[in-house]
Regions:
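S/T-rich, low-complexity, solvent-exposed segments of bacterial secretion/appendage proteins
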Residues: 1-462
Length: 462
């Protein structure tokens, strides 16, 4: 029976050679209690072999290391994916990117400075207005895409919270099955494999600390709160309106000094990565609106009107060409103000495009503080954070590659311990089969001896 049980275990290993998370099992054989003959110095006679236990070949230290690296991988994968989406949204360098649109906007003012009068002047003014519309719509579109990305990240956070809760419940149920099986001296090896696989999945979502009690059940701690203890799951909650993830006691799930897991990675992407670039985009749109409006209000339109804003809005989402400009091209202030002897505004002299030139020169920089020093260069501000985005994206890609390599190496080490080698199992199968056949031959020989003893003794010579 022992050899048959060992063969069954080998068969189970072979059948699950390609099953994800399966740990190789081994039938541990031990001699049974010997029979002692009575009398002085009679000795003992062996009574055979029995399966002492079915051992699951697994290294808990390697599991802990693998999960430790998985939590870092989960965070970096989210960061890389988010930065790649940001790069796709900005579309730089590209003909329709914000950098090109800013260049075209200021180039239109440069052209207006050369041709401020007559029908040609009106035609160029129309180009200026259209380039202003294109620039403001580009800001609007980028802001909308960043808002959509934020909403998508928020949805993903809710999905991850549900995943954490689902995994915790499944692990709790497996805890109960494992404790029940092992309390009855049954091996719960396959159940433990399923639980370890769930723990691997959970470790990639949130940073976990796992402890197993003497009955075989595991408890799970996430940061400073217990997620699972015994049969109690403290499920995470998520409020889509605030974006907060909370524990049942109302305490918010807060990341530590180092971020781990895809859930914390998503929170970082939403609250830090995307939010920072959205703030910078709003800041750039506001700078352009302030700078152009300040200079535009200082100039005069074709009818001598001054003090007209070219843009309206204070951020990327609200930026637009002002209603005054949209309603009348002549209000575009290409010239310096002109006054009569009574200091009343009059139409500027022909050929004056001085104010348009000053607006065109804003491309090279703007004195936002009025101290005579240029402190804001629009293209420089934009190109700097686009370059920063590229650098951060490359860093995230490298970190993902590094973490994938580490987890693959650790998983290979785990497989060296727990994985099924078909060659080894085939060798074991032959070995156990031969032992089984030999045992059968022994039984046959004993049977023949007993037959001779019982049925044939005393028949000789008859």
């Amino acid at each position: 029976m022992a050899q048959q049980r060992a063969l069954e275990t080998t068969s189970h290993n072979i059948a699950n050679a390609n099953t994800k998370g399966y740990s190789r099992q081994e039938a541990v054989l031990a001699t049974t209690t010997p029979y002692s003959y009575p009398g002085m110095g009679a000795g003992q006679v062996g009574t055979g072999v029995a399966v002492q236990r079915l051992r699951r070949l697994r290294e808990s230290f390697l599991d802990a290391q693998f999960r430790n690296e998985s939590k870092a991988l989960g965070r970096w994968e989210v960061r890389r994916d988010t930065l790649e989406k940001l790069e796709a949204i900005l579309n730089e360098p590209g003909d329709n990117g914000l950098s090109k649109l800013m260049d075209r906007f200021f180039a239109a003012w440069q052209e207006l400075a050369k041709n401020p009068d007559g029908d040609q002047g009106l035609a160029v003014r129309s180009v200026v207005r259209q380039e202003g519309i294109a620039l403001s719509e580009a800001f609007n579109h980028l802001a909308a895409q960043l808002n959509d990305l934020t909403a998508d990240l928020n949805t993903s956070i809710g999905v991850r919270v549900n995943e954490v809760n689902s995994l915790a419940r499944q692990i709790r149920d497996l805890n109960a099955q494992i404790v029940k099986a092992e309390s009855g001296n049954m091996a719960a090896n396959d159940l433990r494999d399923r639980r370890d696989l769930l723990l691997d999945d959970l470790a990639k979502v949130v940073p976990i600390q796992v402890e197993e009690d003497r009955y075989g059940a595991v408890s799970i701690v996430v940061r400073d709160h217990t997620l699972l203890s015994g049969q109690q799951v403290n499920e995470l909650g998520f409020d889509p309106s605030t974006g907060k993830v909370t524990w049942p006691d109302g305490v918010e799930l807060v990341a530590g000094a180092h971020l781990y897991g895809s859930l914390e990675g998503l929170q970082e992407a939403r609250d830090s990565v995307v939010a920072d670039y959205k703030d910078q985009l709003d800041k750039l749109a506001n700078y352009i609106a302030q700078a152009v409006n300040a200079q535009h209000k200082a100039g005069a339109g074709l009818d001598g009107t001054t003090g007209v804003d070219f843009f309206e809005g204070t951020d990327a989402g609200s930026l637009k060409v002002s209603d005054a400009i949209m309603g009348n091209l002549e209000t575009i202030a290409a010239a310096a103000p002109a006054y009569d002897d009574d200091h009343n505004p009059v139409p500027p002299p022909p050929g004056d495009g001085s104010n348009a030139l000053l607006i065109a020169q804003l491309k090279n920089g703007w004195d936002s503080n009025g101290d005579g020093k240029i402190d804001v260069v629009f293209s420089g501000e934009y190109n700097a954070w686009v370059a920063d985005l590229g650098v951060k994206g490359q860093e995230a890609s490298r970190m993902v590659d590094n973490q994938e390599l580490l987890t693959e190496q650790l998983d290979s080490r785990r497989q060296a311990v727990s994985g099924v080698s078909l060659d080894e199992e085939m060798t074991n199968m032959v070995r156990f089969q031969q032992a089984y056949n030999a045992a059968a031959r022994v039984i046959t020989a004993v049977d023949e001896m007993l037959d001779t003893l019982i049925n044939r003794t005393g028949l000789a010579g008859r």
